[in-house]
Curated annotation (Swiss-Prot):
It holds the Pfam family SAICAR_synt. GO terms for biological process: 'de novo' IMP biosynthetic process; cobalamin biosynthetic process. GO terms for molecular function: ATP binding; phosphoribosylaminoimidazolesuccinocarboxamide synthase activity. PANTHER family: MULTIFUNCTIONAL PROTEIN ADE2, SI:DKEY-6E2.2. Pathway: Purine metabolism; IMP biosynthesis via de novo pathway; 5-amino-1-(5-phospho-D-ribosyl)imidazole-4-carboxamide from 5-amino-1-(5-phospho-D-ribosyl)imidazole-4-carboxylate: step 1/2. Belongs to the SAICAR synthetase family. SUPFAM superfamilies: SAICAR synthase-like (SSF56104). It comes from Enterobacter sp. (strain 638). InterPro entries: SAICAR_synt/ADE2_N, SAICAR_synt_PurC, SAICAR_synth, SAICAR_synthetase, SAICAR_synthetase_CS. The gene is purC. Keywords: ATP-binding, Ligase, Nucleotide-binding, Purine biosynthesis. PROSITE patterns: SAICAR_SYNTHETASE_1, SAICAR_SYNTHETASE_2. This is Phosphoribosylaminoimidazole-succinocarboxamide synthase. Its EC number is 6.3.2.6.
Amino acid sequence: MQKQAELYRGKAKTVYSTENPDLLVLEFRNDTSAGDGARIEQFDRKGMVNNKFNHFIMSKLADAGIPTQMEALLSDTECLVKKLDMVPVECVVRNRAAGSLVKRLGIEEGIELNPPLFDLFLKNDEMHDPMVNESYCETFGWVSKENLARMQELTFKANDVLKKLFDDAGLILVDFKLEFGLYKGEVVLGDEFSPDGSRLWDKETLDKMDKDRFRQSLGGLIEAYEAVAHRLGVKLD
């Protein structure tokens, strides 16, 4: 399957059309951003690591019965995916307090959240992805009540699968975001799962093994991503 026209260029990925109107090529670039794109740097191997990491995770979720857009790994930095009608709202699950939750509520970083929190955010960089709720989604027509309920169900199911996967690898799944779309009327998991859109801490040291290393200028971003991949058994080379 060959990529054709560039359809969309995001902060770290580019989407291309193919000869099949139902399929797209997703290219992972080496770009890394923070502050809604205000700060951007490039890191060698990042596109490759995230592409193979994402394919690995999507395969695990598909094995658990979660419908995903993933079709095939095409190259080190490209994968073939179903074309989805994306929902403009992203889902976030929080197993521990971190990031914006700590700032918003003034709570201690790292405390366990039981049951996990479920948040919704409107995908809009200019407005810094404002938090919304089910009522907003219904009133503004972003997603139907039924499809939103399905998104929440799949997000919590993914959390159950991934918490165990990372725990077995000596990592804490602190939080993560998922994006969904519709494929022939069905709610399907899209976009990506990688250390770019999740928080992962070492169980013993609580070292941050995700994009917070870039956000907080801790250094060692790619080394952390590759370490996580190796612990999970992701084949990078």
